[in-house]
UniProtKB/Swiss-Prot annotation:
Allosterically activated by 'Lys-63'-linked di-ubiquitin. Zn(2+) 3 binds at C633, C636, H643, C648. GO terms for cellular component: clathrin-coated vesicle; cytosol; nucleoplasm; nucleus. The lineage of its organism: Eukaryota, Metazoa, Chordata, Craniata, Vertebrata. Pathway: Protein modification; protein ubiquitination. Zn(2+) 5 binds at C700, C703, H716, C724. It catalyses: S-ubiquitinyl-[E2 ubiquitin-conjugating enzyme]-L-cysteine + [acceptor protein]-L-lysine = [E2 ubiquitin-conjugating enzyme]-L-cysteine + N(6)-ubiquitinyl-[acceptor protein]-L-lysine. Residues 511-728 are annotated as: TRIAD supradomain. Auto-ubiquitinated. Zn(2+) 1 binds at C515, C518, C537, C540. This is E3 ubiquitin-protein ligase RNF216. Residues 46-117, 131-161, 211-240 are annotated as: Disordered. Signal peptide: none annotated. There is a cross-link at K100, K351, K354, K425, K430, K448, K459, K485, K619, K658, K666, K765, K773 (Glycyl lysine isopeptide (Lys-Gly) (interchain with G-Cter in SUMO2)).
Length: 866
């Protein structure tokens, strides 16, 4: 405020509604000075505290506004607009100027005392005066009527402009949770609170204290001696120049300047607007994010308003509030879907798919520009390899930077492992001559690339470098992918090294812990525990969970300790189990829970096995899977469009193949036992007749009834397979194959007879496989004793009858003066097959008369030459 300005106005805001925070307690009664002498300055405000007013200067119930008569020098009123609006809309003919902040003892007071824009009524309590510093108080009554008229006009116009801006902020104020908060009694002292919004026809109305009833919650009396009570604290900066003009309170218990029977919605909005500037926005955003992750159907903005209005700055408190009030506002614009659903993928994943640049099968060739940049980067990374070899490898790998760099790095790493350790430049150069090449190998699936690459004599000194911003998007993405993967690999190697060192330290100190399952010794970091703190190694838990989930299909993984009845917590399973086993476990668990809760309403699609809930009286099943969408019959599982008003039996009879298939399915179902609790099919391969389902139910395999334990079976001793002579209970150890075969045979005969009756004897076709007669049991024969050879007379066998002409005699070599003749090899004589004589026995030598014409040798070799 300028020094020469004496036309100042002081407004005593006796009842200004504010937040009960500690900062506002120190500032809400601060002085506020209003100057109307200059339009270029922002008007500071001084609030005179009520306990410091003098009783001798008590005035009437009138509001006095002191100003000059000239309209051109009309001062601005209080900045009653919203935080984003600096001044009110002036009447026509008045120039709009940008206000400038003036000096003030406390800048925070100017920022805090800003009623909201939607206020249409200003209530000034009796005793709250607007006066100037230089003029006496008696002159204030002269201009009260004129000031009231202009004040009402300005307030009405400003409230009309800001009415639309406040509608969006009040979206949740009508909710019943906020109504209960608004109606709670609160202690109100020295506050000017905006009244509830009135209709547009009543804009600009000024109400006084005498028009309202008394307070519903009076303020406690101030203490004697000038010490303010807890409801009226001293201002942060005392008033020095106004000490002689302080006004005393007209009543020890002044009432509020507004009625309490209606809602205080503008009140609460003002509180929120002031508190939002003080609250850590990062904490609020984190609370909103975590709460929406747990309650994805909550409406937008509702959680943030709950935080501000109810001061719930704890995640557990917010979750408990939503659980206790399930009728909170919910979203209607979209369907909430599990982000890990295998049916529908999120839009982000669809727009930006995550590509594994190390997978050769998923890569596509890049253009020439990307190839050139990738080659330049690789030549800068591998300066000991020739540019031809680098470009060849890059071309073979479709021009991708990441996979080429990984292949070259692996080849050099393998060369470093195979090369001997050297120290010194001379030895290194000598070894480089001996190991001056690397074997580049890339194998992935059916792709196999090999080449021997030789090192350069000297490293490449000149190579082109690129700024990261100058790279093409494809090359930059691959470079970032490679760096991230290398970082993850290095972290994994460090982690494995840390585990190894940790285990060595445990072993050195003798602190290894024994596993309760395999009795191996492990460090504590490699162990997991059940809810009762029984320790097991991770390998045992993985094998146990794999067998339980994929084998027996257990719903709960209980402790492997024999005497423990606890199970493994979900947090331990998530840390230890692989993703495949964990997902299957969750799938089994969800399936069992849904089947237990809706056993009669759970239906699976016959095409894709997608489960869904369907009312028992609905016959048509529409698969909700977006990749299937087939409509089938719930009973016969046939396509619904093929029914056309036909029953399931008529539809099956209409198509002979389907009819035969349905009969064969009945025959197959005769061998399958279904659980009475969950409906799972069971087939016994071996063991006793007490069957246990994965859901925990027990049944008899013979009579197919629900049982509990072994009391259902016969307990009398008897021979295996023999019926009991004392009771008619089921046997524990029997083979139910015969009973199943009889039932299948009955179903097959009934279907064949029905087919003969409808189609006739000539068109009869066998249904199902032919019945196999059971193999007759052959009595076990004891081993026969070995016969002892005896000299018994042997029967004479008839001679073997030959049906061929006599054998040709071998040619005789003529001898003329003993000169050898070149006649070639002499063919061997024909040898007939031996007679069918049993000679493989253990008796003594038998002299049998054989054919005397048979030769006793096979003759010379066929290619024998003399």
């Amino acid at each position: 405020m300028e020094e020469g300005n004496n036309n100042e106005e002081v407004i005593h805001l006796n009842n200004f509604h504010c937040h009960r925070g500690q900062e506002w307690i120190n500032l809400r009664d601060g002085p506020i000075t209003i100057s109307d002498s200059s339009d270029e300055e922002r008007i500071p405000m001084l609030v005179t505290p009520a306990p410091q007013q003098h009783e001798e200067e008590d005035l009437d119930d009138d509001v006095i506004l002191t100003e000059d008569d000239s309209e051109d020098d009309y001062g601005e009123f209080l900045d009653l607009g919203p935080p984003g609006i600096s001044e009110f809309t002036k009447p026509s003919g008045q120039t709009e100027r940008e206000p400038k902040p003036g000096p003030s003892h406390n800048q925070a007071a100017n920022d805090i005392v800003n009623p909201r824009s939607e206020q249409k009524v200003i209530i000034l309590e009796e005793g709250s005066l607007l006066y100037t510093e230089s003029d006496p108080l008696e002159t204030q009554n002269q201009s009260s009527e004129d000031s009231e008229t202009e004040l009402l006009s300005n307030l009405g116009e400003s409230a009309a402009l800001a009415d639309d801006q406040a509608i969006e902020e009040d979206c949740w104020l009508d909710h019943p949770y906020f109504q209960s908060l608004n109606q709670q009694p609160r202690e109100i002292t020295n506050q000017v609170v905006p009244q509830e919004r009135q209709p547009e026809a009543e804009l600009g109305r000024l109400l006084f204290q005498h028009e309202f009833p008394g307070p519903a919650f009076p303020r406690p009396e101030p203490q004697q001696g000038g010490i303010s009570g807890p409801s009226s604290p001293q201002p942060a900066h005392p008033l020095g120049e106004f000490e002689d003009q302080q006004l005393a309170s007209d009543d020890e218990e002044p009432g509020p300047a507004f009625p309490m029977q209606e809602s205080q919605e503008p009140n609460l909005e003002n509180i929120w607007g002031q508190e939002a500037a003080e609250v850590d926005q990062e904490l609020v955003e984190l609370l909103v994010k975590e709460t929406e992750a747990r309650f994805p159907d909550v409406a937008n903005g509702f959680i943030e308003e709950i935080i501000h209005f109810k001061n719930y700055y704890d995640l557990n408190v917010l979750c408990n509030f939503l659980l206790e009030n399930p009728d909170y506002p919910k979203r209607e614009d979209r369907i909430i879907i599990n982000p890990s659903s295998s049916l529908l993928a999120s839009q982000d994943e669809t727009k930006l798919p995550k590509i594994d640049f190390f997978d050769y099968s998923k890569l596509t060739p890049l253009d020439q520009r990307c190839f050139i940049q990738a080659a330049d980067l690789l030549m800068a990374d591998f300066k000991v390899l020739s540019s031809q070899d680098i470009k060849w490898a890059l071309h073979e790998l479709k021009g991708h930077y990441a996979i080429t760099r990984k292949a070259l790095s692996d080849a050099i790493k393998k060369w470093q492992e195979l090369s001997p350790e050297t120290s010194g430049k001379r030895k290194k150069r000598k070894q480089m001559n001996q190991y001056s090449y690397i074997d580049f190998k890339f194998e992935q699936g059916d792709i196999k690339i090999e080449k021997r690459m030789f090192f350069l004599e000297n490293k490449r000194r000149h190579c082109r470098s690129y700024d990261r911003r100058a790279l093409l998007p494809a090359v930059q993405q691959e470079q970032e992918f490679y760096e991230q993967k290398i970082k993850e690999m290095a972290e994994h190697e460090d982690f494995l090294l840390a585990l190894q060192m940790n285990e060595e330290q445990y072993q050195k100190d003798g602190q290894l812990i024994e596993c309760r399952c395999c009795y191996g010794e492990f460090p504590f970091e490699e162990l997991t525990q059940c809810a009762d703190a029984h320790l097991f190694c991770k390998e045992c838990l993985i094998r146990y969970a794999q067998e339980a989930v994929f084998g027996s299909g257990k719903l709960e993984l209980s402790c492997m300790e024999g005497s423990c009845t606890c199970s493994f917590p979900t947090s331990e399973l998530e840390k230890v189990l692989p993703q495949t086993i964990l997902y299957k476990y969750y799938e089994r668990k969800a399936e069992e829970e849904v089947a237990a809760a809706y056993a009669d309403e759970l239906v699976r699609c016959p095409s894709c096995s997608f489960p869904a809930l369907l009312d028992s009286d609905v016959k048509r099943f529409s698969c909700p899977n977006p990749h299937c969408r087939k409509e089938t019959c719930r009973k016969c599982q046939g396509l619904w469009k093929e029914h056309n008003g036909l029953t399931c039996e008529e539809l099956a009879e209409k198509d002979d193949i389907k009819y035969r298939t349905s009969i064969e399915e009945k025959m197959t179902a005769a061998r399958i036992r279904k659980c009475h609790k969950c409906g799972t099919g069971l087939i016994k391969s071996e063991g006793c007749n007490r069957m246990s389902c994965r859901c925990g139910a027990q049944m008899c395999y013979l009579c197919r009834v629900s049982i509990n334990g072994y009391d259902h079976f016969c307990q009398h001793p008897r021979s295996p397979g023999a019926p009991c002579q004392e009771c008619s209970r089921c046997s524990l150890w029997t083979d139910p194959t015969e009973d199943d075969e009889k039932l299948i045979e009955e179903i097959q005969k009934e279907a064949e007879e029905e087919q003969k009756r409808k189609n006739g004897e000539n068109t009869f076709k066998r249904i199902g496989p032919p019945l196999e007669k059971p193999v007759e049991k052959v009595q076990r024969v004891e081993a026969l004793p070995r016969p002892v050879p005896q000299n018994l007379p042997q029967p004479q066998m008839p001679p073997y009858a030959f049906a061929h002409p006599p054998f040709p005699l071998p040619p005789v070599r003529p001898v003329f003066n003993n000169f050898p003749l070149n006649m070639g090899p002499i063919p061997a004589p024909y040898v007939p097959p031996l007679p069918n004589v049993r000679v493989n026995y253990d008796f003594g030598p038998i002299h049998m008369p054989l054919e005397h014409n048979l030769p006793m040798h096979f003759g010379p070799q066929p290619r024998h030459r003399f």
